[in-house]
UniProtKB/Swiss-Prot annotation:
Keyword set, alphabetical order: FAD, Flavoprotein, NADP, Oxidoreductase
Enzyme's top EC category: oxidoreductase
Binding positions for FAD per the UniProt entry: 38, 46, 51, 91, 125, 291, 331
Gene3D superfamilies found in the cross-reference section: FAD/NAD(P)-binding domain
Source organism: Orientia tsutsugamushi (strain Boryong) (Rickettsia tsutsugamushi)
Protein name: Ferredoxin--NADP reductase
Cofactor binding note: Binds 1 FAD per subunit.
Length: 338
């Protein structure tokens, strides 16, 4: 009889973000016993912890859907299946013996399976913080690195710093509620979708957004953590002082695969190299999908991750049961094994 902290599964999924959840759905459709491990204490990954209100535009059949709503829909999709979740736990150990993959979590849970899928996004993540004098006095009061409630910014003066998709997307989203938005970027060129940048330029013509380029943050002023002004400078020594109630800084994430680095997988710039057909890593039986997976021609889209999840799970099925699955359309509830 197994100890209560020792479990068996057909497949273990590391990561409970959108791609991990869709992998859970695929496992359920194949009637595979599935366990999920995630370091966060809730389901949803970055979608719920970093940008729940952020609009997503590239999910088929949804012209626009917020990150939080997408997770809610995925949770409903996997609800019929008896999935076991180990939340608030990190995978700290992995060993393979006779084709059995055994992982150990930080909560001393042991899970044995024949297949494992890593859907860990960018891994453990930390925001790239601002390096400014006295920044700690303002952080989590009037300086933030993510947005969880856009209503906080109603009729407020907001400075948004950054030149990527996150900065642009939040400028567009908050332009409907903020009094004014100052978009600060150190370069004149932005790293974002051209359509989104064109929308920003239209808002600038109407005065809802002021594009402060090429400038970078230099100094914050205020009292008791309440921001009053943001000083910005350019490379020619020019300065501007921006009145501000809030500052949002979107300079990306510092990602870390954590203990996964020690598994012996081949990695490339904090991502895991996989076979582009099966999404299997350099260790048989271990697969990687979503943003954490790397292969030639990779597109870092949620949609791509969904397709990778379906393919990887089909190969997990073959490994677990020793035969190819009998594919049926997803209109059939619970795909037969063959």
């Amino acid at each position: 009889m197994l100890s209560k902290n020792v479990h068996t599964a057909d497949v273990v999924i590391v990561g409970a973000g959108p791609v991990g959840l869709f992998a859970v759905f695929q496992a359920g459709m194949l009637e595979m016993k599935c366990h999920v491990v995630d370091a966060l204490d809730c389901i949803g990954g970055q979608c719920v912890t970093l940008y729940p209100d952020k609009p997503i535009y590239d999910i088929p059949a949804y012209p626009v859907i917020t990150a939080a709503k997408l997770i809610e829909q995925l949770k409903q999709q996997v609800a019929p299946f008896d999935t076991v979740y180990h939340l608030g736990q990190q995978v700290i150990g992995c060993k393979i013996d006779n084709d059995i993959i055994t992982i150990t979590t930080s909560a001393e849970q042991v899970i044995c399976s024949k297949s494992l899928i890593i859907a860990a996004g960018c891994g453990a993540f930390k925001y790239k913080r601002l390096i400014l004098d006295n920044i700690e006095a303002f952080e989590n009061k009037t300086v933030f690195y993510s947005v969880k409630d856009k209503n906080k910014f109603i009729n407020k003066k907001v400075v948004i710093a950054g030149g990527g998709d996150s900065a642009i997307d939040w400028t567009l989203l908050l332009s409907d509620v903020a009094e004014v938005i100052y978009l600060v970027h150190r370069r004149e060129n932005f790293r974002c979708a051209p359509h989104s940048l064109n929308q920003i330029k239209q808002l600038a013509e109407y005065g809802k957004v002021q594009m402060i380029v090429p400038y970078q943050l230099a100094k914050l002023t205020g009292e008791n953590g309440l921001l009053q002004e943001v000083l910005v400078t350019n490379f020619n020594g020019g300065t501007q002082t921006l009145p501000a109630d809030y500052l949002l800084a979107f300079f990306g994430l510092a990602a870390d695969l954590g203990p996964i680095h020690k598994w012996g997988l081949k990695t490339d710039l904090r991502r895991i190299e996989v076979n582009s057909i099966t999404y299997e890593t350099t260790i048989p039986g271990i697969y990687a999908i979503g943003d954490v997976a790397s292969y030639p021609g990779k597109l870092k889209l949620i949609l791509t991750g969904f397709a990778e999840a379906a393919t990887a799970m089909s190969h997990c099925y073959q490994r677990v049961f020793g035969k190819k699955m009998h594919f049926q359309y997803s209109t059939v509830k619970g795909v037969l094994r063959s």
